[in-house]
């Protein structure tokens, strides 16, 4: 009996050792609060207007500036590589105010971000130590890196910096307002005044017909990929011939999808370089 009791005590002791495993090593975001939000994406853009107006430029943030927003786009479909679209809607500001609905890209160097940053997940980001600026005119939070041609550009932050600079807030809510796209009219897309950093990046939907669709062609065959490993398709609106580029990287589900013929609505991340461009998040963004 004494031996049996001893064995049971030993077994219980071993089980207790494994009841609550230490999972700290599996966390990629801060396990502690970053503090109170003291800044907004709108303030970030307005305070750095000259920086965000450039094509390729960046600077490091030296102070504790904590912003908050919701993940409105991620790499769930494999098309937005190392990219999170962080969007914040300030309901205290009136409809039509440019500062009410602002977004920015947070680049994170990791092969698949979706398990950690699901659509509808609210996050805080402490900008201190990170870099802000533009990559090919796209407003972004990241870190500088050297391209293969030796140019210094704003790339994604290292994954380990998420543990000190990024905090998850609550649970993901994919039905939240920030995950609902803004429907852009042909008139809005044509207006030159809208082609500025306050209007992109953003989650939007556009309607039109893909010029290259023939019932067989797919979005992004490798045979057509450019130096950026992507393929551009042209979406045309029937009302006023407004054109938007749909850019798709190769080697993902969207890339191998046959482009639908006729008029459809496409949802994705909006940017602007020499023309308006959207990148779909997943195949379900085609309606």
Label each residue range with its predicted role.
Residues 15-81, 85-92, 100-287:
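OB-fold nucleic-acid-binding modules
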Residues 9-13:
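C-terminal motif of bacterial Sec signal peptides marking the signal peptidase cleavage site
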């Amino acid at each position: 009996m004494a031996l049996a009791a001893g064995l049971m005590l030993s077994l219980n002791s071993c089980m207790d050792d494994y009841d609550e495993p230490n999972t700290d090593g599996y966390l990629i975001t801060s396990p502690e609060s970053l503090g109170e939000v003291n800044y907004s994406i709108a303030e970030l853009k307005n305070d750095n207007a000259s920086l965000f107006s450039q094509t390729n430029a960046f600077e490091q943030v030296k102070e504790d500036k904590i912003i908050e927003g919701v993940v409105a786009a991620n790499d769930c479909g494999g098309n937005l590589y190392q990219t999170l679209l962080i969007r914040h809607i300030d309901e205290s500001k009136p409809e039509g105010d440019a500062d009410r609905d602002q977004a920015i890209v947070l680049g994170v160097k990791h092969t698949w971000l979706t398990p950690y940053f699901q659509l509808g997940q609210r996050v805080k980001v402490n900008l201190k130590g990170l870099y802000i600026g533009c990559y090919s005119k796209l407003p972004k939070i990241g870190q500088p890196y050297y391209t293969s041609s030796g140019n210094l550009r704003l790339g994604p932050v290292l994954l380990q910096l998420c543990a000190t600079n990024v905090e998850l807030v609550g649970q993901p809510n994919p039905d939240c307002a920030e995950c609902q796209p803004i429907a852009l009219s042909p008139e809005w897309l044509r207006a030159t005044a809208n082609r500025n950093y306050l209007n992109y990046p953003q989650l939007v939907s556009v309607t039109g017909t893909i010029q290259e669709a023939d019932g067989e062609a797919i979005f992004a065959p490798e045979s057509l990929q450019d130096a950026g490993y992507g393929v551009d398709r042209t979406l045309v609106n029937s009302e006023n011939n407004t054109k938007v580029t749909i850019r798709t990287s190769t080697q993902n589900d969207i890339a191998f999808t046959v482009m639908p013929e006729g008029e459809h609505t496409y949802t994705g991340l909006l940017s602007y370089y020499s023309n308006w461009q959207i990148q779909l998040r997943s195949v379900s963004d085609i309606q």
